[in-house]
Amino acid sequence: MFKVNEYFEGKVKSLAFKDGNCDATIGVMAKGEYEFGTSTKEVMIVISGKLLIKFPNCDNWHEYSKYDCFTIEANKKFQVKTPGDSAYICRYYNDAQGCNCNCNC
Protein backbone atom coordinates (compact mmCIF):
# COMPACT_ATOMS: atom_id res chain seq x y z
CA MET A 1 0.00 0.00 0.00
CA PHE A 2 1.07 3.59 -0.47
CA LYS A 3 2.48 5.68 2.35
CA VAL A 4 1.56 9.37 2.44
CA ASN A 5 4.27 11.81 3.58
CA GLU A 6 3.66 15.45 4.50
CA TYR A 7 6.31 18.07 5.31
CA PHE A 8 6.58 21.81 5.90
CA GLU A 9 3.01 22.28 7.14
CA GLY A 10 1.56 20.49 4.11
CA LYS A 11 3.50 22.46 1.51
CA VAL A 12 5.36 19.30 0.42
CA LYS A 13 3.49 16.01 0.03
CA SER A 14 4.46 12.68 -1.47
CA LEU A 15 3.28 9.12 -1.96
CA ALA A 16 5.83 6.36 -1.34
CA PHE A 17 5.86 3.27 -3.57
CA LYS A 18 8.16 0.52 -4.90
CA ASP A 19 9.69 1.28 -8.32
CA GLY A 20 11.24 -1.98 -9.45
CA ASN A 21 13.93 -2.83 -6.91
CA CYS A 22 14.08 0.55 -5.22
CA ASP A 23 11.88 2.71 -3.04
CA ALA A 24 10.48 5.84 -4.63
CA THR A 25 8.17 8.76 -4.00
CA ILE A 26 6.12 10.92 -6.29
CA GLY A 27 5.48 14.31 -4.80
CA VAL A 28 4.46 17.92 -5.10
CA MET A 29 5.89 21.13 -3.64
CA ALA A 30 4.13 24.45 -3.25
CA LYS A 31 5.99 27.67 -4.00
CA GLY A 32 8.63 28.19 -1.33
CA GLU A 33 12.07 27.35 0.05
CA TYR A 34 12.89 24.08 1.79
CA GLU A 35 15.82 22.13 3.22
CA PHE A 36 15.92 18.34 3.00
CA GLY A 37 18.28 15.70 4.35
CA THR A 38 19.08 12.34 2.79
CA SER A 39 19.72 8.97 4.40
CA THR A 40 20.37 7.18 1.10
CA LYS A 41 21.46 8.26 -2.36
CA GLU A 42 18.53 10.03 -4.06
CA VAL A 43 17.88 10.64 -7.73
CA MET A 44 15.20 13.27 -8.34
CA ILE A 45 13.43 13.87 -11.63
CA VAL A 46 11.37 17.01 -12.12
CA ILE A 47 8.06 16.15 -13.79
CA SER A 48 6.38 19.56 -13.66
CA GLY A 49 7.43 23.08 -12.80
CA LYS A 50 10.93 24.16 -11.84
CA LEU A 51 13.26 23.41 -8.92
CA LEU A 52 16.31 25.44 -7.92
CA ILE A 53 18.77 23.29 -5.99
CA LYS A 54 21.64 24.34 -3.75
CA PHE A 55 23.82 21.27 -3.39
CA PRO A 56 25.87 20.47 -0.26
CA ASN A 57 29.08 22.54 -0.06
CA CYS A 58 27.99 24.65 -3.03
CA ASP A 59 27.24 28.37 -3.05
CA ASN A 60 25.38 28.43 -6.38
CA TRP A 61 21.80 27.51 -7.21
CA HIS A 62 21.22 25.08 -10.10
CA GLU A 63 17.96 25.17 -12.07
CA TYR A 64 16.10 22.01 -13.08
CA SER A 65 12.97 21.94 -15.26
CA LYS A 66 10.62 19.28 -16.59
CA TYR A 67 12.41 15.92 -17.18
CA ASP A 68 15.72 17.16 -15.72
CA CYS A 69 17.26 15.04 -12.99
CA PHE A 70 19.91 15.38 -10.30
CA THR A 71 21.54 13.21 -7.65
CA ILE A 72 22.10 13.84 -3.96
CA GLU A 73 24.45 11.50 -2.10
CA ALA A 74 23.51 9.83 1.19
CA ASN A 75 23.68 11.72 4.50
CA LYS A 76 23.66 15.19 2.93
CA LYS A 77 21.47 18.27 3.31
CA PHE A 78 20.38 20.32 0.32
CA GLN A 79 18.18 23.34 -0.26
CA VAL A 80 15.29 23.65 -2.70
CA LYS A 81 13.47 26.72 -4.02
CA THR A 82 10.45 26.46 -6.27
CA PRO A 83 8.91 29.57 -7.85
CA GLY A 84 5.54 27.82 -8.22
CA ASP A 85 3.89 24.45 -7.74
CA SER A 86 6.22 21.65 -8.87
CA ALA A 87 6.10 17.87 -9.06
CA TYR A 88 8.87 15.28 -8.88
CA ILE A 89 9.78 11.62 -8.67
CA CYS A 90 12.50 10.62 -6.21
CA ARG A 91 14.22 7.21 -6.26
CA TYR A 92 16.20 6.02 -3.23
CA TYR A 93 19.28 3.80 -3.60
CA ASN A 94 21.42 2.06 -1.00
CA ASP A 95 25.12 1.30 -1.58
CA ALA A 96 24.36 -2.09 -3.13
CA GLN A 97 22.10 -0.53 -5.76
CA GLY A 98 23.22 1.55 -8.68
CA CYS A 99 21.21 4.23 -10.37
CA ASN A 100 19.47 2.38 -13.16
CA CYS A 101 17.31 5.25 -14.30
CA ASN A 102 17.64 6.50 -17.84
CA CYS A 103 18.38 10.13 -16.98
CA ASN A 104 22.18 10.44 -17.34
CA CYS A 105 22.66 11.39 -13.69
For each of these PLM feature ranges, what is it?
Residues 18, 54-56, 81, 93:
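A generic structural motif
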Residues 10-11, 19-39, 66-74:
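Conserved short histidine dyad/triad with adjacent acidic residue
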Residues 73-100:
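Ligand-binding loop in jelly-roll beta-barrel domains
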